[in-house]
Structures are given as structure tokens and as C-alpha cells.
């Protein structure tokens, strides 16, 4: 617990100026187009809560991704000070939210150590948010303030009482700043996992309301536990080596944890003051130097180099190594604003000295583990030598082939890699269609026979001797392995995996992705790998055939068919609503139903569909008990009418004591088991609810007694819009035959070009890695040697599978 317990407006130091943020957001938060800036918004808010935890006042943080892509971050810290700031004349909370570089971390006494990726504070998040709602629980009171684009809508005000404490920030990023507002679970989970390991004992709950997924990140044991986590499902060669030292001579703190495993991949993570360095830097250089020197000294001292007649390198030492280097530096220097590379020269000396000292002691004190590590290093050197010989053999064979390219490859005429595409296709039949259907100028085709080697289980020299892998490496042209690999020699910057939509196709795609992830991850990082998306359906109507790409396009096609020659009549005598007007109404209805489906993990659709037909509830109405009671009676009447055998609904009002609101709550009793759903203030304030009530107003004024729909000569009386739409859809599908489509070989060359290869109409998925640690574990679990973790994975995820097609 911190010694200075006074945390009020006097702790908040101000460095002014916020206008520049809206003009040049990239300087403050990162790229606003590729998602990095968007996710930094969350990290800036979370870092404030982490600072509270480091000071000893916060133990729980929750992050919620809402269905409308807004975010709530809540902690149980002290709560931001609410008293009036002497310099600024407004509440300290408003200063923190509206002034750049204002906060406790600029006052040396409040936070001794603080995170912060860009160190710009939550005010930048506020400036770049369409709306931000700040809720503070402090001194048994609840305070609230709302901002639009950083502008306060009213002064901080007291809204209720509470027993808890802490800060809650709910924000919706501004579409004026960010071109794509979609939060990635993987990107958030990656950083939160790092923070929870680097800050032992703090529980961080990540919850995604879009999918229902949630995970608690809470780890004791710091970096040692982090290494053990990274090596899950791998066989460890040694116990985790770990040290943590604070140097007095230069004030640098060095913590290292490492462990070798039986895989062939190196996994090194570097941090400075809790911030990750993707490109390493001086701390990594110092670590590598000390590691290689110590191991080579040990090999020399034991006489192993002469015995095995082999020379080892630093690369051999790092095969199968998982290590984390974390340094605490008073004033770190980085190569750029994004802090991806540390350049402080004194850190190299610090890490090299401490690592050299502690690791030498480890090798001397643990002779059995030292022998196991060195044995693995010598095995790696032997495999490297075997791989070199295999490469030379491949080269000699290749010299006989024209230009050294595999005979199977149908190359393209274009020599600029940025304009060239390589289609990796499954089998010769699809390869034949693809070769005939392609654009020869820019599209090359490489058919692979059967399933390529699973590189997760194979050593490097065995992998090189595999014919299909060798063919692929030669076609790509960039080489493989540390000595040979050169991304600049890659012959295609668009590598497209095109396999059938069946089990074998999925397996081949997974084997190829395993190869790229393990051997050429840079191709994925640069966005060169794609997966082709052939159409899912073929629809026949009379003599007409049409390919349809996915379920959404199928629904659109069937809706068009249903609305042909169709009309909706408000009553018996009214003219019909048809054509574009009817299509617009159907699309609006479908949009609302899609919204309700998206919300259904939180609020069951069987309840929310009634809101279309009920009066609109405003946020102000929630404070009026009698108004809410009247609305509830109408809601209960509809629920009672919808009850089925074994299922009953009971609606009531629940008081929110913090804010003095009356919230509708429904008890669902299914076969004697009760579950409860509460519709909270955020639900009624959301754009989603607004769209439901607007559609309701439109539909409720539309249908009268005697309403009907008509298609051609056929009529159907209706009492609800849904009944009419369902009847029209059923009528529209009658004369269609629908074929679910699986194999590429089923298409002729012309169809393959039109649907899957023509750059003007095709759809492709770009392969990305947003959470490398999670990706590593998935590949290890699904493609590795251990069977038990794979069975556990399948059992725990089986129920989440949709569209299982085997």
C-alpha cells in the first residue's frame, strides 16, 4: 500500500493542449485505419487502472466489448478525485478527461512506476470518442459526466449512492476518426495477458458481449509463470531459470525467465517498463550475447566440441528456447514513438552482466539440466549441418531444371512480385481447371498432390526432404531457414490457398498455414497470405443457374425472388405497397431482427421482439415508477400470450438503488428452472433500442384489420408483418433447386475464373496473426504430438461449432 494516502485534485498535474489530438490523432494514439490506434484507446484506459493496482489500491479490472462496438473499462480502485482543481476551476475528473498530459503519473509521489503506451492519458481517448461516459464511485457516492468528442455536456454531478469505489469509463470511438470500428478479442487478449503476468495478482476480466466469450486473466508468479504458460503442451528440457535484480549503479532493473522445450522454434519476448518491444533492442542484444557466450564456455570447459566434432552457433543455442526479458529503466530511449525497439545503450551492459553472472551459476549448480540444454544445442547444430547438405543436394538437382522452378508450377508472365499471384491448389483436377481459367499475365498455379508434411512434428532436415514442401519452397523463391531465407527474393506478394470446402480441403489448408506460421511468419505479418472463398451455393431456376457466395447473399437472392410481383395491403381497400418501397421496409425489418439476434446472448430474442410492438421507453421514463408500471403491464400481456407448454414469463420492476431507476426484469421459468434477464439503463439508451422502437412506430401504424399480402394471383390475410414476410419467402423459394457446393473440380475453368479468380468479383480472406501467443498454442495443440490437449480442445469447443459439414 502506498505511503501517501491522499489522492485528490492536488495530485493531478496538468500539461495543456488537446485541440491537436483531433487534427493529428495518429501522433497520439497510433494508426487510425489499421486497428492499432483503435485498440490503443482501450489500453490507455486500462493503463490508468493498472497504475492504481501498482500503487496498491486496485485488485480487479473488467473490460467489456459491447454489441455496438463500444467499450467499458471498470476498476475497484479509489475512483478519480471529484473535488475542484485549484488551477483549472473545474473538477479534477474533468481536468483528467479534457487536458492532455494531465494525471497522477506526472506527479512523482502519486505513482512511482507507471505504464502507459504513449503516455498521453485518457483525455486523448475522450477527444476521439463520439461519446464517453465517466462514472466515479468514491466516498459512498456515484458521480457522472458525459462528453461528446471530448466536450463535457454538463459538469460532473452526483447521481446516486454506493458501497463500492472505483472508476468506470464507457466510450464509443468516433467514426470521424477511425475508418473501421471493430474490436478484436485477440489483440485485446494479447496485451491483457501480458499485463496480468507483468502485474502479478491483478485480476483482469475480458468479456465480449458480441459472442458471449469471457476470460479472467489472473496469474501469480510473474515472468516464471509466463514462461510456463508459453510452454504449455510442450515437453520442457529444464526447470524455469529466473532472476530479478535491481542494479544500484545505473538504476536499471533486470528480470529474465527462460526454459527450453522440445520444439524447434525460438520464442523471445522483450518488455521495457511493461511495454512490449516487437523489434527487441539493446536488452535483447545483451541477453543473446550472454546466453551464447555462457553455453559456448560450458561446451569448451566440458570438451564437448572436440568429442562431437561440431561447431555450435547462437542460433543452435536458441532452438526451442522460450525466454522473457523485462527491464525497468528510469528514462528509456526508443527508436520511435511506438516504442517497438529499445535503444538505451546502458541496458545492453546491464542485461549482459546480470545474465552472464546468474546463468553461469545456474549451469554450474544444475549439471544435469546443463547437459540436457547443451545436448539439445548440439542436436540443433547437427540438424543444421544435415539441412545444409540436403539444400546442396536440392540445388544440384535444381540446376538441371530450367530456371530452377518446379515442373508442376504454371508460372505467370509478370515479374513484379507485388503484381503476381500464386494459387496453391489441391490436386491435379482443380489444378487443371485453374490453369485453364487463370489470367496468365499475373496468376501462377501450383497444384499440390495429397497432404503436405505436418511441419509441427518434423525437424528441419526431414521437412526439406519432403517433395511437396520442397516444391512449395522452390516456387516461392525466398529460401528457408536462417542462412537462406530472404523475403526480398519472394516471387509473389499474393499467395492464395485454394482448397475444396470439405474435410480434406480444411486439413490441407491447416497444414499449409502451419508451414507458413512456423517457417515463414513474415509472409503472414506482411499480409501476403490469403484464403480463396469459392461460392457456397448453386441455385437453379428453370434453365438459369447462379452461383451464390454465402448465406447472407443467399438470403438477399431469396428475398429478391420473394418480392417479385408481391405487394402488401394495409387493409382490404388500400392500394398495395410494392417494389422499392416494400423492399426498403423488408430490409429495415431484417436489420432490426439482425440487431436483436446480435443482442440475444444478453437479451433473449423471444423477449426483445415484443419491443417492436410496445410504446418507446426513454431513459427519463426509467426514473418514473408509475410510467414504467403501465408499460410493464403491456409487456406482460404480450409475454403471457406467447407462453408455451413448460415455459412461462413473469415481468417485474427492479430498483437500481445507485441511480434510483426502475428497470424491467423478466423471470423465465422453463420446466421448473428459473433464469432472470434485466433490461438496464444502457440498453434503453442504446442506438440498438432506438432502431427497434423506430421500426415499431412504422409497423404499428401500417397494418389495420383486413390487411393482406399478395404474390401474383395468390393472397394471404395477415395480422403481423412477420407473417406476411414468412409467407412471401415460402412462395418465393418454391421453384428453386439449391445445391450446396463443395469441390473446385466440379467447376469448369470459365466458372472458376468468374467466381473465385477474377480480381473484380472474387472474395478472399487475408490471414493475420493478432495474438501470436494464442496462435502458437492453437497450432501446438491441434498439430503437435500430444493427444490429450487436442481431445480436451475438441470436447470443450464441440458445441460452439456451426455449419459442420463432413
From Swiss-Prot:
Record's catalysed reaction(s): ATP-dependent breakage, passage and rejoining of double-stranded DNA
What family, per the record? Belongs to the type II topoisomerase GyrB family.
Toprim domain residues? 420-535
Tell me the cofactors it needs: Mg(2+); Mn(2+); Ca(2+)
Gene from which this protein is expressed: gyrB
Q: Which residues bind Mg(2+) 2?
A: 500, 502
Q: Where is this site: Interaction with DNA?
A: 451, 454
- Output the PANTHER family linked to this UniProt entry: DNA GYRASE SUBUNIT B, MITOCHONDRIAL (PTHR45866:SF1), DNA GYRASE/TOPOISOMERASE SUBUNIT B (PTHR45866)
- Gene Ontology CC terms, in alphabetical order: chromosome; cytoplasm
Q: Which domain of life is it from?
A: Bacteria
Biological processes, Gene Ontology terms: DNA topological change; DNA-templated DNA replication
Q: What else is known?
A: Few gyrases are as efficient as E.coli at forming negative supercoils. Not all organisms have 2 type II topoisomerases; in organisms with a single type II topoisomerase this enzyme also has to decatenate newly replicated chromosomes.
Q: Does the keyword ATP-binding apply?
A: yes
Q: In its keyword annotation, does this UniProt entry include Transcription regulation?
A: no
- Subunit description: Heterotetramer, composed of two GyrA and two GyrB chains. In the heterotetramer, GyrA contains the active site tyrosine that forms a transient covalent intermediate with DNA, while GyrB binds cofactors and catalyzes ATP hydrolysis.
Q: What InterPro entries does the record tag this protein with?
A: DNA_gyrase_B_C (IPR002288), GyrB (IPR011557), GyrB_hook (IPR049353), GyrB_insert (IPR041423), HATPase_C_sf (IPR036890), Ribosomal_Su5_D2-typ_SF (IPR020568), Ribsml_uS5_D2-typ_fold_subgr (IPR014721), Topo_IIA (IPR001241)
One matching Pfam family, short form? GyrB_insert
Protein name, as recorded: DNA gyrase subunit B
Described function:
A type II topoisomerase that negatively supercoils closed circular double-stranded (ds) DNA in an ATP-dependent manner to modulate DNA topology and maintain chromosomes in an underwound state. Negative supercoiling favors strand separation, and DNA replication, transcription, recombination and repair, all of which involve strand separation. Also able to catalyze the interconversion of other topological isomers of dsDNA rings, including catenanes and knotted rings. Type II topoisomerases break and join 2 DNA strands simultaneously in an ATP-dependent manner.
Q: Which SMART domains match?
A: HATPase_c, TOP2c
Q: Which GO terms describe its molecular function?
A: ATP binding; DNA binding; DNA topoisomerase type II (double strand cut, ATP-hydrolyzing) activity; metal ion binding
Q: Which keywords has UniProt assigned to this entry?
A: ATP-binding, Cytoplasm, DNA-binding, Isomerase, Magnesium, Metal-binding, Nucleotide-binding, Topoisomerase
Q: Where in the cell is it found?
A: Cytoplasm
In this chain, Mg(2+) 1 is annotated as bound at 426, 500
The UniProt entry lists the main location of this chain as cytoplasm
